[in-house]
Design a protein with these regions (language model features):
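Short, Gly/Pro- and small/polar-rich lid/capping loops
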Residues: 1-10
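Polar low-complexity intrinsically disordered regions
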Residues: 2, 195, 225-227
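Charge-rich, well-structured scaffold segments of protease-associated domains
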Residues: 7, 61-213, 219, 229, ...
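Active/ligand-binding-proximal structured segments within catalytic/core domains
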Residues: 11, 18-68, 179, 251-263, ...
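Generic preference for hydrophobic
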Residues: 14-16, 28, 186, 241, ...
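Short, conserved beta-strand segments within well-ordered enzyme catalytic domains
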Residues: 15, 27-29, 52, 76-78, ...
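His/Glu-based metal-binding/catalytic segments typifying zinc-dependent metallopeptidases
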Residues: 18-22, 27-29, 212-269
Length: 405
C-alpha cells in the first residue's frame, strides 16, 4: 500500500492509496454536518446529503442513480454530527466516471422542487423508523441530553417541523457555503497511478472557486449528569450510559480508543460482555462506542436487558469503570488488550472500504492519513497510567444515563 498526496490550487486536498485490487473507491469528505445547522433548520445537512443525488444541470435523478449502478458500482453517502461522506465503489476502469459524477454533484446540483418534495417524505419515514427502533432512538435522545443547549444537541435526522419547511434555497445555500474546496478532501483507493487520479481530480474539481467556508462552531459545555427513565412500553429496556471525553487530537485519544475496546468492543471477551452477559446473564446486548470530534468527544455504553436488571447492570458498569480509573492495569493484561485491538485493526484494514473512509477522514481533519502501522505504534505506547486517566472521564460523578422501557 502506497500513499500519495496532492493539493489543487483552489485548496482541495487529495489523497490516493494505491492498491492491487481491481475494486476502486473514491469520494469526498466534507467538513459539514448536523452541528453546522442553524436553529429552525435541523436536518438540513442530512437532507442535502439525500437530495444532492436528485438532479444537476447535466443529469436528472435517474441518470445519477444509474451512472455507477450500470457498470456494477455503487454511489452512496452518509452524514454525521460534523461531516458528510459522498463516495462510490466500482470496477477500477470506471474511475473517470466516478470522479466526474462526484464533481457534478457538488458543483452543479439544482435540487428540483418535485424531487425535494418526494425525498422529504423518504427522510420523514427514515426518521420515523428510527423512532420505532428504541435501540437506535435511545442513542439520539441520550446525545441530545448530553449536549443540551449546544449545536450538538439535536439529532442528525432533524425535526419533522423543520424538515417540512426546508426549501430549495436552503439546500442551495448550504451546498454553496460549505461544499467548497477548502472544506473538503478527495480520497481514492485503487490500482490507478497517482498522477492519473490527480489529473482526473484536477480536471473535475480544478474550476471550483477558492472560497473559505464560514466556521462558527462553539465548543460544547459540560452538562450536569442526568439519569432519566422514559416509559415507552417495550418488553426490553434500552439503556445508554456515558460521558463527554476529549477531542480527536487530545493526547489521550489512543488510550480512549483502547479503553473503549476493552470495555465493550466487538470481541465477545470484552469486559462488559463477560461481566454482564456471560457471568450474570443480565443483558442480551452490551457494547461501547467512542465518538471523537474536532473539539469534543463522548463515550457511550449501550445495553439491552430486562427492565428489572437495569439498575444492577449500571452498578456493575460503575464498578468496572471506577476500578479502571483507580487501579493501574497490570502490564501483562494491558499487553493482551493491545494485542487484541491491534489485531482487529489489521483485520479491518484488509477492507478497501475501511481504507477509503479512513483516508477521507484523516485528510479532512488531520491533514494526513495515519497508516494502520502508525496507529498500532500509538496504541502500543499507551501506558497503564494513560488508561487510568482515560477511565477517569467515566467516573461515577461524570456518568449520565437514559433508559427506554
Amino acid at each position: 500500500m502506497s500513499l500519495y498526496y496532492h493539493t489543487l490550487a483552489n485548496g482541495l486536498r487529495l489523497v490516493h492509496i494505491m492498491t492491487p485490487s481491481r475494486v476502486a473507491w473514491c469520494g469526498l469528505a466534507v467538513n459539514a454536518g448536523s452541528r453546522d445547522e442553524a436553529s429552525g433548520y435541523y436536518g438540513l445537512a442530512h437532507f442535502v446529503e439525500h437530495t444532492i443525488f436528485k438532479g444537476t444541470t447535466h443529469r436528472r435523478a435517474w441518470h445519477i442513480l444509474n451512472r455507477m449502478e450500470r457498470v456494477g458500482g455503487e454511489l452512496n453517502a452518509y452524514t454525521t454530527k460534523e461531516g458528510t461522506m459522498l463516495y462510490s465503489v466500482f470496477p477500477d476502469e470506471h474511475l473517470p466516471r466516478a470522479v466526474d459524477l462526484l464533481a457534478d454533484l457538488v458543483q452543479w446540483s439544482v435540487f428540483p422542487q418535485e424531487e425535494l418534495d418526494r425525498e422529504r417524505d423518504v427522510v420523514l419515514e427514515e426518521a420515523a423508523s428510527y423512532r420505532d427502533t428504541p435501540s437506535d432512538a435511545v442513542y439520539d435522545d441520550f446525545e441530545d441530553l448530553l449536549f443540551a443547549g449546544s449545536e450538538l444537541g439535536h439529532n442528525i435526522l432533524g425535526r419533522k417541523e423543520d424538515l417540512e419547511r426546508l426549501t430549495r434555497d436552503d439546500c442551495m445555500r448550504y451546498l454553496k457555503t460549505l461544499y467548497v474546496p477548502a472544506n473538503m478532501a478527495f480520497f481514492s483507493v485503487g490500482p490507478a497511478r497517482p498522477e492519473r487520479v490527480f489529473g482526473l481530480a484536477e480536471k473535475a474539481f480544478g474550476g471550483m472557486s477558492h472560497a473559505l467556508a464560514p466556521r462558527h462552531r462553539a465548543v460544547p459545555t459540560a452538562v450536569a449528569p442526568f439519569n432519566k427513565v422514559i416509559q415507552i412500553g417495550t418488553h426490553q429496556a434500552h439503556t445508554v450510559v456515558g460521558a463527554q471525553v476529549p477531542d480527536m487530537k487530545h493526547p489521550l485519544r489512543h488510550a480512549l480508543m483502547l479503553l473503549n475496546n476493552i470495555l465493550g468492543g466487538p470481541g465477545m471477551n470484552s469486559l462488559l460482555n463477560v461481566e454482564l452477559r456471560e457471568r450474570r446473564g443480565y443483558v442480551y446486548t452490551v457494547e461501547s462506542t467512542l465518538t471523537l470530534l474536532s473539539d469534543c468527544g463522548w463515550m457511550e455504553i449501550y445495553l439491552g436487558c430486562d427492565p428489572d436488571d437495569v439498575k444492577s447492570s449500571l452498578r456493575v458498569i460503575d464498578r468496572i469503570t471506577a476500578r479502571l480509573g483507580q487501579e493501574l492495569l497490570p502490564e501483562r493484561r494491558l499487553e493482551a488488550y493491545k494485542k487484541q485491538y491491534c489485531g482487529q485493526l489489521v483485520v479491518a484494514a484488509d477492507s478497501s472500504e475501511f481504507m477509503a473512509m479512513r483516508a477521507g477522514r484523516g485528510l479532512l481533519y488531520h491533514g494526513s492519513v495515519s497508516t494502520v502501522a502508525q496507529t498500532i505504534e500509538s496504541i502500543q505506547a499507551v501506558t497503564p497510567e494513560d488508561i487510568a486517566r482515560a477511565a477517569a472521564y467515566l467516573a461515577h460523578d461524570r456518568l449520565s444515563s437514559l433508559t427506554f422501557q
